[in-house]
From Swiss-Prot:
It comes from Pantholops hodgsonii (Chiru). The modification Phosphoserine is found at S4, S36, S50, S103, S125, S132, S139. The gene is HBA. The modification N6-acetyllysine is found at K17. This is Hemoglobin subunit alpha. O2 binds at H59. The modification Phosphothreonine is found at T109, T135, T138. Heme b binds at H88. GO terms for cellular component: blood microparticle; haptoglobin-hemoglobin complex; hemoglobin complex. The keyword Nucleotide-binding does not apply. The modification N6-succinyllysine is found at K8, K12, K17, K41. Coiled coil: none annotated. One of its GO terms (molecular function) is organic acid binding. Keywords: Acetylation, Heme, Iron, Metal-binding, Oxygen transport, Phosphoprotein, Transport.
Length: 142
């Protein structure tokens, strides 16, 4: 999915508002995903998945760091996320549908925390961005 100039601007502005909360929002999105889609827990059998768990917070930080890196390289998502794509496809073997589920819960989390900034246009741009990230992360499954 190609991001327009307006989409790129919206994504950068929205992610800028996330600021230092990126890790916390990432962890919250993971918690939402585990609660809403319990089958996603199967990829984390060694994690304490309880609310506020240090392991979920740590993984939320990793998710947020990857997305922050992607926001900084919107014109080269495949190159930027190549290592993560390899990891998820070949080592972790994560079912691709899980990227869509996490994208959904991340959008919900952002909408809750940034209600005044989460306009329909920003929502659409973030959705396209997260779909693009998901496409890149699943590109090496073939």
């Amino acid at each position: 999915m190609v991001l327009s100039a307006a989409d790129k601007s919206n994504v950068k502005a929205a992610w800028g508002k996330v600021g230092g909360n990126a890790g916390a929002y990432g962890a919250e999105a993971l918690e939402r995903m585990f609660l809403s889609f319990p089958t996603t827990k199967t990829y984390f059998p060694h994690f304490d998945l309880s609310h506020g768990s240090a392991q979920v917070k740590g993984h939320g930080e990793k998710v947020a760091a990857a997305l922050t890196k992607a926001v900084g390289h919107l014109d080269d998502l495949p190159g930027t996320l190549s290592d993560l794509s390899d990891l998820h496809a070949h080592k972790l073997r994560v079912d691709p549908v899980n990227f869509k589920l996490l994208s959904h819960t991340l959008l919900v989390t952002l909408a809750c925390h940034l209600p005044n900034d989460f306009t329909p246009a920003v929502h659409a741009s973030l959705d396209k961005f997260l779909a693009s990230v998901g496409t890149v992360l699943t590109s090496k499954y073939r």
